[in-house]
UniProtKB/Swiss-Prot annotation:
GO biological process annotation, one example: unsaturated fatty acid biosynthetic process
Localization: Cytoplasm
UniProt pathway: Lipid metabolism; fatty acid biosynthesis
Keyword list, A-Z: Cytoplasm, Fatty acid biosynthesis, Fatty acid metabolism, Isomerase, Lipid biosynthesis, Lipid metabolism, Lyase
Taxonomic lineage of the native organism: Bacteria, Pseudomonadati, Pseudomonadota, Gammaproteobacteria, Enterobacterales
Nucleotide-binding is among the record's keywords: no
Organism, scientific name: Sodalis glossinidius (strain morsitans)
Gene of this entry: fabA
Official protein name in the record: 3-hydroxydecanoyl-[acyl-carrier-protein] dehydratase
Amino acid sequence: MVDKRESYTKEDLLASSRGELFGKEGPQLPAPNMLMMDRVVKMTDDGGNYNKGFVEAELDIHPDMWFFGCHFIGDPVMPGCLGLDAMWQLVGFYLGWLGGKGKGRALGVGEVKFTGQILPSAKKVTYRIHFRRVINRKLVMGMADGEVLCDGTVIYTASDLKVGLFKDTAAF
């Protein structure tokens, strides 16, 4: 039985990365350094822009985060692909929250737009995922739109995020 709470702490997210939150057959979040959130502040199966589910999560920004030291030397900025990956992570996490089983894999995105950046001076990144559709049959797949906010301002948007859960990834 899935522990379906509305919010999750950093410790809960780390438990997910070890396969402990949604069970051995459920999807896992990545471990640090690739875990791109500190907490999930809201999860609902009937909210969001399409009334099909909503997730909101946050990442606290610190100037000593690993990516600022290498992207770019003398011009530190969080790579945009990490924000995109965070949105995929949250789509997969939501599928596990719904009781989906399998290994999560990003399947694509329709369009991504970057209109801002995350610098070491930022305080908080917020991710919002609005589900368009969830298929929960032999194929388990989530389709959603997402946005990334830096200190309250929308800086990335993504449409048609897709994540699937697979029992066997050998042929993937």
